[in-house]
Every structure is written in structure tokens, then in C-alpha cells.
């Protein structure tokens, strides 16, 4: 088990990074809530943080890992109902070069296969393990909470 840093608010963590003269290797945003509707708000918050980070550190590596019920808003069958969210997420991936992962294990608990997500969504075997991998690489973990 990897010891995860204890973090304050996500805004305080962003301010801490912005106060540094050199960037971390990368930033990984973690979203995990038991609320299917939360991803819309979380993506808006993450987008704001990415803009702030990229203004100071244009080449910063950024990843986003969703591994709660909110990840189901990214399923292919939700593309029409959640079209604004899907467009925002695609823009983060294409325009901001953000790597996005959802949790295959969590999805499997609800009988959802990786193929039920669109191609722009990477279905990781396990969201927490994906986050641990980023932290091992030197990414700073920022948790997005309600």
C-alpha cells in the first residue's frame, strides 16, 4: 500500500502548486463520489484549475481519474443526455491534452463493460491503482470533492 499525501482543499492545493517556481512532474485529479450528477460540477472545477496551472506551467502533465458513480455519466449511452459534459471532457482530452481514466472495477460491479464507454475514455483496470501509478511517477494528487 502506498502512503497517499493528506491534502487540504483542492483550491489550496492548486494555489500551493502555483506558488512554486518549478512544476511537479504532473497533476492527477481524483473524482470519486456516490453521485451520478457530480461529474458535471467536478469537470467545471477541474477545467478552471487546468487553465490556472497551464497559464503558469504550459507543459504540465495532467490526468483525471474518475472512479465513483459519477463515471457512469461518461458512458456511450449517456452521450445524448450528457452531451455538454461529453463535449467538455473531449475538449479537455483533445485541446488540453489531459489523460482521462475511469475505473473498470467499479464499472464491473454494476455489470458495465469497458466497451460501454466511448473511445475517448480510457477504462483503467482499477482507478485507485491508476492514481497510485501517477503518484509514483511524481504527480501531485488533487482530490475533487463535493
Language model features with spans:
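Structural recognition of the beta-strand scaffold that forms the well-ordered cores
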Residues: 27-30, 63-66, 99-102, 143
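Solvent-exposed coil/turn segments that connect beta secondary-structure elements
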Residues: 34, 67-70, 105
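Histidine-anchored nucleotide/phosphate-binding helix
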Residues: 41-55
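A cross-taxonomic marker for long C-terminal extensions/tails that follow the last structured domain
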Residues: 75-146
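Acidic helix-start/capping segments at beta-turn-to-alpha-helix junctions
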Residues: 60-74
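Glycine/serine-rich loop-strand microenvironments at binding/catalytic pocket rims
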Residues: 1-41, 124-132, 139-146
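Surface-exposed patches in mature extracellular/periplasmic domains of secreted proteins
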Residues: 53-64, 102-105
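Envelope-exposed proteins and targeting segments
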Residues: 25-27, 58-60, 96, 119
Amino acid at each position: 500500500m502506498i502512503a497517499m499525501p493528506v491534502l487540504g482543499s483542492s483550491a489550496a492545493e492548486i494555489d500551493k502548486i502555483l506558488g512554486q517556481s518549478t512544476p511537479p512532474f504532473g497533476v492527477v485529479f481524483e473524482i470519486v463520489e456516490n453521485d451520478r450528477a457530480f461529474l458535471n460540477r467536478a469537470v467545471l472545477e477541474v477545467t478552471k484549475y487546468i487553465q490556472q496551472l497551464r497559464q503558469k506551467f504550459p507543459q504540465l502533465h495532467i490526468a483525471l481519474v474518475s472512479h465513483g458513480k459519477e463515471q457512469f455519466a461518461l458512458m456511450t449511452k449517456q452521450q445524448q443526455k450528457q452531451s455538454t459534459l461529453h463535449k467538455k471532457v473531449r475538449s479537455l482530452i483533445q485541446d488540453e491534452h489531459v489523460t482521462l481514466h475511469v475505473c473498470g472495477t467499479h464499472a464491473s460491479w454494476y455489470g458495465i463493460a469497458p466497451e460501454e464507454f466511448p473511445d475517448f475514455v480510457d477504462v483503467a483496470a482499477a482507478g485507485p491503482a491508476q492514481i497510485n501509478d501517477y503518484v509514483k511517477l511524481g504527480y501531485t494528487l488533487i482530490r475533487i470533492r463535493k
